[in-house]
């Protein structure tokens, strides 16, 4: 049995669904929301690589590397902002973020 395009798309759909559920079911913790966004980006990358391999074109794989780079930078900056926010406020709850308005 070979692993075809449908298998990759099914795994990507499951990861995408888990990411969406993580965002909608847990709106109180910013770290969980950030991790859910990363799951969504991972699902998109799996789709890009799967279609790129299926079509025999390398552009999708190059774009997936670009998306991974941007996602890593986004996660690093987001976590750094959360650490500073936690040190100042003592909480990372979404309800407390509106206090940052200034």
From Swiss-Prot:
Give start-end ranges for the coiled-coil region(s): none
Q: Which organism is it from?
A: Bradyrhizobium sp. (strain ORS 278)
Q: Has the keyword Transmembrane been applied to this entry? A: yes
Q: Cellular component terms, GO, for this chain's entry?
A: NADH dehydrogenase complex; plasma membrane
- Give the protein name, as stated in the record: NADH-quinone oxidoreductase subunit K
Q: What is its EC number?
A: 7.1.1.-
Q: What does this protein do?
A: NDH-1 shuttles electrons from NADH, via FMN and iron-sulfur (Fe-S) centers, to quinones in the respiratory chain. The immediate electron acceptor for the enzyme in this species is believed to be ubiquinone. Couples the redox reaction to proton translocation (for every two electrons transferred, four hydrogen ions are translocated across the cytoplasmic membrane), and thus conserves the redox energy in a proton gradient.
The record's listing under Gene3D superfamilies reads:
1.10.287.3510
Q: Give disulfide pairs as residue numbers.
A: none
Please name the taxonomic classification of the source.
Bacteria, Pseudomonadati, Pseudomonadota, Alphaproteobacteria, Hyphomicrobiales
């Amino acid at each position: 049995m070979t692993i075809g395009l449908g298998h990759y798309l099914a795994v990507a759909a499951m990861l995408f669904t888990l990411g969406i559920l993580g965002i909608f079911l847990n709106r109180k913790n910013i770290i969980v929301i950030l991790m859910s966004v990363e799951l969504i980006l991972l699902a998109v990358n799996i789709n890009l690589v799967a279609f790129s391999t299926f079509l025999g074109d390398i552009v999708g794989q190059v774009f997936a590397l670009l998306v991974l780079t941007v996602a890593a930078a986004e996660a690093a900056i987001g976590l750094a902002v959360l650490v500073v926010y936690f040190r100042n406020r003592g909480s990372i709850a979404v309800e407390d973020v509106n206090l940052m308005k200034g």
